[in-house]
From Swiss-Prot:
Belongs to the gamma-glutamylcyclotransferase family. Keywords: Acyltransferase, Transferase. The active site is at 89 (proton acceptor). It comes from Drosophila melanogaster. This is Putative gamma-glutamylcyclotransferase CG2811.
Length: 157
């Protein structure tokens, strides 16, 4: 029971934080705080999910009602982990974070935080709209440590 009390929030991840993806280690590093996998789900609201920039970053675009019901994973996280995820996502300067309803595999709905981008060039909407993100050899994700241009400055790429 004590562990549940320490958990602060539920977070829906749809990109590089999912299991098997390049940034999943953020959720498993003890020094980042606690994260417990709750299951798979999808957004109740449709959103455009695209891969953009020369670094092949998945972006959930703040255009509710457009795109697809996005598939992802739900984690329960503590305050420390939530603050580390905010750093990774450069919230609130780059990504925004908002509550959305997620339909879990067991058909229950829960409220979760998710990260999305509000300021983007319109041409991002012309990219392939995904249902689920996967890092691929054709579009390999590049971590922050190897980037020469900030992702924010590269949105028009």
């Amino acid at each position: 029971m004590a562990e549940k009390l320490r958990m602060a929030a539920r977070v829906f991840v749809y990109g590089t934080l999912k299991r098997g993806e390049p940034n999943h280690h953020w959720l498993t590093k003890k020094e980042n705080g606690q994260a417990r996998f709750l299951g798979r789900g999808k957004t109740e609201t449709k959103f455009p999910l695209v891969v953009g920039t020369r670094y092949n970053i998945p972006f959930l675009l703040a255009r509710p009602g457009e795109g697809n019901h996005i598939e992802g994973e739900v984690y329960e996280v503590d305050e420390t982990m939530l603050s580390k995820l905010d750093i990774l996502e450069d919230y609130p300067d780059y990504y925004d974070r908002e509550q959305q309803t997620i339909l879990m595999e067991q058909n229950e709905t829960i409220q979760c935080w998710l990260y999305l981008i509000r300021n983007f060039p319109d041409k991002m909407l012309a990219k392939e709209l995904l249902i689920s993100y996967h890092n691929t050899p054709e579009r390999p994700y590049n971590e922050k440590s190897v980037r020469t241009v900030s992702a924010r400055d590269d949105l028009s790429y």
